[in-house]
């Protein structure tokens, strides 16, 4: 497999930048900001990209923690890459081989799980290596790099897609750290991720005086008077009844799921006033848009019913409406060639020592070589596809969930996975994987490998007109077969009570205050 001169330059750039990329990854891991609240992370990327010569739009798509960076080396094709950087509440873990939250916080604060800290820096490494090679070898064309907040709620990409940020690309390169077998050190072939709808039901009790009023008194005079049940009761009823009815919402096939999260509840302490506000978020992950619409209709009807029973009104606010993904074999083949060139990540003795420390601190017997075997080998896309299809109905096109799928509807896209550090044995507590994703010795090998694959793939697209043509022809054919227009018809849901850090007289903390008992 021949490597071009430009690709060799990119590989050398990534190697030379090893220390800097490691420090950058550790910085974003430490920020660990959750969905829609990634202020420091987004600002860091914007500053860095501008310093590297990119034109950067902050707040792209109406999302304060999103951005779109562009750079051109003259007329030619443009290749897209991106960063994610949102963390997950209740996963706060320091970059150490034992269970410990980051300094000054409790385990309830946010932390990187899969980890998006390394996903984003891998994207940045691939981007800057490509730029360096384009400049050195006079390759014409451009690079577009988007900052994608709130992936954990499939937030930004449907919005960016609807507003045209992925239009006009010769190709989009989508990387994610491995999180499920057999998708490790490989490329998705035919079965891409599915659709997802997410919404917040906001129950509002702002006219409690109309519920059960009988004596004309301006307010209830005692705790024993009739009072509106209020927003908390509406939320509890919605939560419980939706769970009871879940099995009746869709046929029992396709690997769909419905999950929920309580965003806000009433503010009263021990008062006997009805709660004025409660918010419940649902995430519906399904193979098709039609399935998502069916579940949404059932939840809408249920929300109306419980609101009427509790003296409330209800509002539905969209968090995401995301389309299923389109495959592109030409792009998959192109990226698979680069994965074979780079190879799987390699962990040295120091990394394996830390992995064994994690095993011991999880109560496991340490392995001489603790690395999960799948992390050290490559698997061909067609072989991974065959394993994936074993548990799916033959007529099912899409499976599992991630919002990169909206990119596939606008540009030829390859979705690939490189091994993050994972251990033999188990099961392991969440802190173990989170720690492995934060310790530089264990996560840097993945960042190096993914950055190289991204750069080699981007340069292949830029240098090979035939490869671009094949990818575009297949994209147009598949889009004609399954053309779903953007579903996003809502603003970014940034105004809700999403988990976040706070600054008070007590200092910097999580919105749930840290205490010795937490």
Region locations from a protein language model:
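Histidine/acidic-residue-rich, glycine-tolerant segments that coordinate divalent metal ions
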Residues: 88, 103-108, 117, 133-259, ...
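Divalent metal-coordination and catalytic microenvironments
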Residues: 28, 49, 69, 81, ...
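An extended, acidic, His-containing surface patch that forms the Zn2+-binding/catalytic region
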Residues: 322-518
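Buried hydrophobic packing segments
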Residues: 45, 122-130, 235-238, 242, ...
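Acidic/His- and Gly-rich active-site-bordering loop/insert found
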Residues: 3-112, 117, 121-141
């Amino acid at each position: 497999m021949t490597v071009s001169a430009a690709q060799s330059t990119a590989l050398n750039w990534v190697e030379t930048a090893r220390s800097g990329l490691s420090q950058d990854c550790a910085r974003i891991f430490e920020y660990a900001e959750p969905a829609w609240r990634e202020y420091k992370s987004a600002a860091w990327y914007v500053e860095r990209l501008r310093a590297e010569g990119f034109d950067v739009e902050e707040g792209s798509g109406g999302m304060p923690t999103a951005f779109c960076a562009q750079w051109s080396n003259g007329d030619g094709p443009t290749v897209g890459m991106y960063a994610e950087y949102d963390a997950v509440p209740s996963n706060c873990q320091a970059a150490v081989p034992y269970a410990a939250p980051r300094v000054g916080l409790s385990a309830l604060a946010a932390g990187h799980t899969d980890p998006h800290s390394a996903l984003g820096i891998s994207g940045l490494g691939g981007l800057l290596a490509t730029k360096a090679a384009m400049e050195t070898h006079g390759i014409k064309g451009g690079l577009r790099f988007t900052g994608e907040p709130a992936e954990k709620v499939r937030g930004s990409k449907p919005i960016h897609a609807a507003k045209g940020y992925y239009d006009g690309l010769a190709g989009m390169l989508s990387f994610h750290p491995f999180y499920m077998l057999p998708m490790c050190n490989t490329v998705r072939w035919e079965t891409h991720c599915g659709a997802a709808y997410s919404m917040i039901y906001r129950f509002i009790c702002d006219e409690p005086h109309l519920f059960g009023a009988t004596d004309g008194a301006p307010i209830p005079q005692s705790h024993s008077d009739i009072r509106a049940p209020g927003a908390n009761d509406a939320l509890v009823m919605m939560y419980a009844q939706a769970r009871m009815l879940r099995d009746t919402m869709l046929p029992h096939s396709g690997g769909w799921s419905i999950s929920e999260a309580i965003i806000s509840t009433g503010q009263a302490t021990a008062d006997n006033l009805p709660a004025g506000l409660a918010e419940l978020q649902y995430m519906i992950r399904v193979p098709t848009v039609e399935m998502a619409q069916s579940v949404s209709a059932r939840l809408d009807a249920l929300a109306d019913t419980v609101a009427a029973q509790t003296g409330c009104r209800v509002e539905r606010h969209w968090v995401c409406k995301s389309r299923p993904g389109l495959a592109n074999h030409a792009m998959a083949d192109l990226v698979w060639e680069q994965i074979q060139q780079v190879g799987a990540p390699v962990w040295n003795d120091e990394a394996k020592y830390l992995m064994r420390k994690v095993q011991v601190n999880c109560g496991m017997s340490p392995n001489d070589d603790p690395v999960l075997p799948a992390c050290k080998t490559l698997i061909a896309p067609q072989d991974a596809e065959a394993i994936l299809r074993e548990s799916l109905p033959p007529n099912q096109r899409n499976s599992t969930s991630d919002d990169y799928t909206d990119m596939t509807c606008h540009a030829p896209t390859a979705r690939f996975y490189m091994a993050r550090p994972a251990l033999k044995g188990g099961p392991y507590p969440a802190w173990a994987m989170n720690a492995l994703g934060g310790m530089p010795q264990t996560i840097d090998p993945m960042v190096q490998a993914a950055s190289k694959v991204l750069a080699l793939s981007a340069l292949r697209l830029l240098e090979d007109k035939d490869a671009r043509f094949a990818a575009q022809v297949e994209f147009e054919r598949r889009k004609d077969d399954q053309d779903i227009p953007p579903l996003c018809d809502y603003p970014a849901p940034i105004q809700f009570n999403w988990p976040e850090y706070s600054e008070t007289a007590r200092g910097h903390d999580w919105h749930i205050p840290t205490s010795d008992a937490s």
